[in-house]
Amino acid sequence: MPNEDIEGKTKIIQEIEDPNLVRIVTKNVLTANDAEIKASISGIADEKTAQTCNIFKLLKQHNIPTAYQSRNDNNSFIAKKCKMVPIECVIRRRPYGSYFKRHPDAVVDQTFDPLLLEFYHKHAVVVPRIQRRVPRYKNNLQIQHLPENEIKWSDTNTTDSPDPSFSGVDIFTDPLIEFDQNPEAIATGVWHLYPAKQPRTANQEPLHKIVPVVGDEEIYFIKNSLMIPTFEVIENAWKKFNVTLVDMKIEVGYTRDGELVVSDVIDNDSWRIWPNGDPKQQLDKQAFRDAPSKLSVVEENYKTVTQYTNKF
């Protein structure tokens, strides 16, 4: 029989009778900036579910491995049950967002060819504030089991009220993983984690060093069989409507059969898209980040994106 549901910020994962499958239910919620910005929008779940189903159907048509099985109803779909890999896989055609924060001299009309591939860890790094020159304290994060004067991991769960015991630490969410560009990381099998939203100084020490969560062969597969093909298929679909796919993120996981697949969701929260290549015409969630009070604009944008993806 089905067990307990797993509820996150924007979706609920429900077990069903088939132990190999789950039902993914989208909530009428948008969040941004590590859930500092949150809004309820009636009907947004239906739009996001339609977008995800349209995208995964497109990927399956191009033989890209995905967890997606079928749409269930207006705000849910059925997918293979996966053990998620705790990394966020980002593909960039153009610089934006955290890339500009790490590379303030970059220009917006720069193009990455080949695509720029980045990995971020899904856990936060918690560092005693005295160790960092540039603090980044996120007071909405719940940090568990923090030893005194030690670097520690924690899931980036949100809480309505910050714990005062966290006031002496800096919390770096979704740290950037460095392994390809770092000879030591390759030689020793260590991943180095750096702040995702700060420039790197010369000889800067990483926030933390960890044992890799997947091996070199898996990273190669994720890059070349999941990340690049996924981006290129979706990029070509958007090009038909003269919409630029600037960047996007995906998550991956292992099915119960051990297959590594694109999983979770891909919807208007997952990318930046600019009609006519113009950032002022953005249709994605960046509009919500920039002006969270203009929910009617955000709602219309999501409806427009659904209409586009219906034609993919």
Predicted feature locations:
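Acidic/polar, glycine-anchored loop/turn motif associated with catalytic or activation segments
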Residues: 1-247, 254-312
